[in-house]
Amino acid sequence: LRVKEGLAMTLADLKHVQKYFRDEEQRDLTMTELKVLDTYWSDHCRHTTFETILQNVTIKAGELQETIQRAYETYLKLREEVHGNRKVMTLMDMATIGGKYLRKHGKLDDLEISDEINACSIEVKVDVDGKEEDWLLMFKNETHNHPTEIEPFGGASTCIGGAIRDPLSGRSYVYQAMRITGAGDITKDISETMEHKLPQSRISKGAAAGYSSYGNQIGLATTYVKEIYDEGYVAKRMEVGAVVGAAPKANVKREKPCPGDIVVLIGGATGRDGVGGATGSSKEHNDTSLTKCSSEVQKGNAPIERKLQRLFRNPKATRMIKKANDFGAGGVSVAVGELADGLNINLDSVPVKYAGLSGTELAISESQERMAVLIEKNDFEAFRQCAYEENLDACIVAEVTEEPRLVMYFQGEKIVDMSRAFLDTNGVRGVQDVEIAEGERDHDPFAPVSSNILDNLRKPNVACQIGMAEMFDASIGKSTVLMPFGGKNQLTPAQVMAAKLPVL
């Protein structure tokens, strides 16, 4: 079944699903339920790799063994102080332990804490025409490594599109962006391309065109652009888009969903593009990925997302929103499914690009430029009017229910019906023994300084990247403080990006 349906879940996950439907629901699951679970529990949506339990950690002998051991022991001490033995050891815990430690010691009091975690949000004071206001400043980054390898233009354009929508769901206006990518040697002859892969030069140029096209159309200043060249990126491309957004705190409310509240879908229509995107990016590439996975890459439409940005900058609209989510990986099943414990979703209400979509496709399609907002039912007409003023569609697709179950209807039939408790298990958690090996040096530290300098100067990483950087508009919005290049000849790359907040 895993191979036939191309599932991302493990055999242990399938047995977990089988046991639940046999013992609790006492029926066979539908194909839509299987696909929804495969999507909802995918590595892309639930970070299953980073949440894998780590055990039996060993550090191999080598010149860096003591350094690695000290770093590991530092983590163990922080972990003991922050949460003792209450949590298992994971890569996610290692990545976040520093922030948790600082927060415990009162050094992150400006961090906004809420159920909505689509972006890192901090509270700041902002000078607006001489008057100090409370604002929320939000940071987010997104990777689109898998789709950019398959379809460079579309993968990179939807990378920045998805990155924008995360702070947008927090009701902030995204005004600044950074792009950091990794590629192999783009100067190699096409004949040397790895089998079943696109040439590195094609990926690099196509991705730069896609990201810059989307960002320039939507009106986002991209002020830091850097591509890193290393043979390690031949096996897996790196495509990272990072954004900064901000909004007056008074325009943002965070409230719990209540039975009778509704979920409104706003933005673009739904098609087959992006079906299987979350699960596809959670699986290994093989010799058929290049030819069979292009439909998993969404088709971006920047002008629609620009309208969404304008709508979310309208305080009349944002003050009606209790909770919001963007339609990224997983489509309806995740964007709507995460907003409340109990939901009745009507897939027939989802606007479509063309006729013929099945209930499964409507449930997991990742068509872009869509947002889900949770509002009170009495606010719908006023909210829809705000959307219409930006030439955006707005329709009710779900209602919050008392019973904690995710239910979906299509053409009068119930095609998904499962408990929130089961859905939130996120499948079967992986367990992994760990052996830390020492990496290889990319240069001889004992070679003469002159030869090391000359060797570095031959590498593409020290070459000027102004040609690529100038594809990206760095001045739109009039808030840029540091331009990408400076110095006497305007050829020295800036090491940071800085911009003023987008106050009106």
Task: Show which residues each predicted segment covers.
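Glycine/proline-enriched, intrinsically flexible loops and inter-domain linkers
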Residues: 1-504
